[in-house]
Amino acid sequence: MRLIDFISERDRYLSFPWMATAGLQLCGYTLYDVYLSPQRQLEVAQRMNQEFDADFSYPMDDGAIFVETLGLPLLKPEFDFPSVLENPVKTTKDLEELQVPNPYSDGRMPLNLKALELIATRIRKPLSLSIQGPFTLAVELVGATDFVRAIIRNPDFIEKVLDFTNQVVGDYARATVKAGTKFICISEPTAVILSPDRFEKMVAVRLRALYNSLGPGVWKVLHICGDTRVLLPHMLKCGAEGLSLDQVMDLSSIIKKFPKNMIILGNLDPIYVLRELSPEEVRAKTLELLRSMKGHSNYMFSFGCDCTPDTPLHNLRAAMEASRTRFVDL
């Protein structure tokens, strides 16, 4: 069954929210309390399912799994995602010192796979997962400034880095599918810096191969932050079944030109709306978004990006409750 078939013929829009670390507020754990325990991953996933009742199950997001397994130094806040402190890959020699991780034996990857197996078998909803994309991982390894310079000055080096990161992400993604992942979203936030031509050559070509390697039974989505209007024609041809778009994008105009067999996801503002407004205002903004999508069966409700760690839980509840409003009541 395709993703478009799964979401069609419903009496309401389905939801795939970007909850980030919200589950920590529910369970009182630090981030690495959860990352290091498949059982706690399951506990958080079950609590999130009870509290917010999305249409997919999901583990705690783990955008740092690749850089951490590759040995990059990280800043590790207790209640927010880790961030890279150094970008060590400046030459081909630096790159050759790294090895593609084995998802079944290296770092925390085996713990994540076990957590996915638990969630897939204990929660009776399709298991969704968001992972960092190969281009964004490459920029993390090299550093944004050096990466952009090398695109012009040393393109062969950049190609080697991208080939490496594509294998890292691909091997892990395929392992997560075997563990039970049904819906996989590849996040390429850094790709927004590229021109359409460079996006096609550096991102789209590799994504098509990666998505294809996951097999036909997996629902595939691409997320890129920011204003991606100039990239949309190429994003639509990346091999994904759906595109997740940022809150700066006008979905009501974009969806009119969107292929009917492609899903568009988004794009409630996680900053201005979810963090700053009252529950009543969040509910109103959610309903406003749903009404703007009315009549389009290829839409799924989501946030424009991850919500912040300090997002009030009552606002998340308000958004998710409103997102389940039936078409006849919009």
Model features per residue range: what roles?
Residues 1-23, 29-32, 55, 79-81, ...:
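Active-site loop segments of alpha/beta catalytic cores
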Residues 23, 30-53, 57:
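Active-site-flanking structural segment that lines cofactor/substrate pockets
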Residues 37-39, 91-94, 278:
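Intrinsic-disorder/low-complexity, polar/charged segments
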Residues 45-74, 101:
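Glycine-rich, N-terminal phosphate-binding loop and its surrounding beta-alpha-beta segment
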Residues 65-102, 118-125:
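A contiguous, low-structure linker/loop signature
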